[in-house]
Amino acid sequence: MRIYNTATRQVEEFTTYVPRLARGYVCGITPYDHMHVGHGRVYVFFDIFRRYLERLGYEVRLVINFTDIDDKIVNKAREEFGHEAYKRWREVPERYIAEYFEMTRRLYIKPAYAYPKVTENVEDMVKWISTLVEKGYAYVAPDGSVYFEVAKVPNYGVLSRQKIEELIAGARVEPEPGKRNPLDFALWKSWTPGEPWWNSPWCPGRPGWHLECVVMSTKHLGAPFDFHGGGADLIFPHHENEIAIARAYFGVDNFARYWIHVGYLTVRGEKMSKSLGNIITLREVLSKHSGEALRLAYAMSHYRKPMEFTYELLQQAEDMAKTLYTAYDELSQALRDAGEKDQEPIAQEALKYAGAFYGALDDDMSTPEAVQQLYGMARYIISTVLHRVEKISRETALAVLNKYVEMADVLGVLERRQIPKELEEAVKALVETRARLRQERQYQLADYIRQRLAELGVELHDFGPRTYYTYRRA
């Protein structure tokens, strides 16, 4: 498999430091507000990436953090709790972390290897800062804040392809009080009255954002690890500063081999923002559409390119999901009608879609092409395999079904394919009754059963004397 590496600006062969073990870190949310569809795009992509690595035989250790203390959280607590914010601020991240797990469950995102929180790792962060100060890469400001000195790190700007001189020119003419350079960033922020704080050798306060991710990722994955990911908006300054910190601490050029970034999501051509009032939350979308439809909608755009979000796209994805389920449901039933041996090369044609599907994912995770191959296989199953299933053996038909499900599992769709046994047995009995009525030419009664089943979300499709059915998933 080949993947684009932001650090080198090239599509590279994916290899890992430890054979068959892929260790990765994706920057998680700052839990101060509802998750939006931009968040969903990032985490669905890395879920598909993780699923594909597992299909290739890797054990995947994916770590996703929660930045559960931040200025935004403090401000939200003040808005909600007023003078009690100092006591109740933890309620804010707890609420939105719970929402994160609800939304990712509804998006069929597999659980991460670990979910570290900043507040549970402050002691480790203080130790890191002490080491950086001792090595001369960080300095203590008069108010007790600690800053990382960017000028001490060679090749700063390597990830974002920016030169330090140009960055300084684009920054403020005068650095903030306590800073030696406008580009220097906080490793430790001194306490402000009314805000949460932790003890440190320098002053009461809390850690800085860029430090947090380096400490938590390497704590769980070691250094160097295989891939580090997030949204494209994190390339600078966040990921650039992570690299600088790790270079100073470990003395290595890069503490992650591949840097993988997901493109922006836009609404009516503009990036989502509160100021524009165009934020679309995951809760809003998932109240109207299935998680699988949203996964397909995301996958229809290449992860590195901007994605325009529309409800028309979601409806298209919903229709596609319905077709995928129809192919699965009906081929599952058609196994009983398969022949004893293969008389036509129907299966070989079906399995060509699988080759193209995996070829697309091997080529920098080209999910738009992979989606089209899965959808193409579904249509081929419906248009050809079901009509001529008696021309292939049961083993061959089962091989087609298994390969189809395997492909769907990589994209995280067909997750609702299991139907309660009682419901399936009841539907099967009604379908058999309808088949007898058709043989007896009692078409009015047969149509009545079809109609009633449709009202219950069961669609019947006749293939000559055979009838297969599909369920409408809620």
Curated annotation (Swiss-Prot):
Q: Which positions does the motif 'KMSKS' region occupy? A: 271-275
Cofactor names? Zn(2+)
* Chain sites annotated for binding ATP: 274
- Intervals of motif 'HIGH' region: 29-39
Which of the seven top EC classes does this enzyme belong to? ligase
The protein's annotated catalytic reaction(s) are: tRNA(Cys) + L-cysteine + ATP = L-cysteinyl-tRNA(Cys) + AMP + diphosphate
Q: What is its EC number?
A: 6.1.1.16
The keyword Transit peptide appears for this protein: no
Q: Name one GO cellular component term.
A: cytoplasm
Record key words, sorted? Aminoacyl-tRNA synthetase, ATP-binding, Cytoplasm, Ligase, Metal-binding, Nucleotide-binding, Protein biosynthesis, Zinc
Bound cofactor: record note: Binds 1 zinc ion per subunit.
Subcellular locations according to the entry = Cytoplasm
The UniProt similarity line reads: Belongs to the class-I aminoacyl-tRNA synthetase family.
Protein name, entry field: Cysteine--tRNA ligase
Q: Which organism is it from?
A: Pyrobaculum neutrophilum (strain DSM 2338 / JCM 9278 / NBRC 100436 / V24Sta) (Thermoproteus neutrophilus)
Annotated gene? cysS
